[in-house]
Amino acid sequence: DLFEIHEAFAAQILATMKAWESPEFCRERLGRLEPLGAIDRGKLNPKGGSIAIGHPFGATGARVLGGAAKQLAARGHGRALLSVCTGGGMGVTAILER
């Protein structure tokens, strides 16, 4: 229903979306017969994402999580996929459900 992806490195989001849509990448790198598919751009960071909230270093994850939880509460239902970087080339993902 909702994708909240920390876009401090916006090129990473664009590359990931392109990879998910690519039959060749999904077949050769992920061993899938079909692509993962496209992310509905209207469901991606609908409130502007972490850059829009000021990219607070050290608190981005909490801000992204809190924002997604608030959006799900306003809708009364749904799921959100969250992804944030943790520095040093690492990242964390989570799925919220209401």
Q: What do the predicted segments below correspond to?
A:
Residues D1-R98:
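Claisen-condensing/thiolase-fold acyl-transfer catalytic domains that form or cleave C-C bonds
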